[in-house]
Amino acid sequence: NYTKVPLVIHETFFYTSDTLKNGGREMFGFLKKKNEVVENNTMYAVANGTVIPISEVNDPVFSQKMMGDGYAVVPENGEIYAPIEGEVLSVFQTKHAIGLKMTNGLEILLHMGIDTVELNGAPFTIKVKAGDQVTADTVVAIADLEAIKAAGKGTEMVVIITNMDKVAQFSLEKTGVVTAGTPVGSATAN
């Protein structure tokens, strides 16, 4: 009991010399979109623990937003996850920080602990490298929280947007006890 209805699809192509040089691939949007990345503005909890506003971090460089806006997680255990969907830009030689880039172009610094640069990487096992693609369920590092505490350092995992000039809006929407990978905020690029 189907009715046959004619379907007419009409497409107009405008050829340019660039289109012809590239074998006409630009004519077909579906070929081009295969490599496009969908923007994701969501920021996630990097560990099981307690999310706090960056203003509550016990270090003025972070709490006064000198490096940018963001949030922190006081972790319950040492499994540290990516705070965003995107790409790893760099891993600091001292292993205490990882630079990332969101799919929307915003740059994020995951700073593991307070003053942990002085520990020369000892309490951190890094699980990613520059160029890796990450999601909220990607473990980026294992932090030995007991070693960090024994050295007299804070264990807060601080997530900072470092290129604030490119931010249209940042909002921290969830604080308190969370599990790793829980959406806690968003950052949109301008």
Question: What is the meaning of each model-derived region?
Answer:
Residues 1-26:
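Short, Lys/Arg-enriched N-terminal segments with co-localized hydrophobic residues
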Residues 24-190:
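Contiguous, well-folded functional domains in the mature portion of proteins
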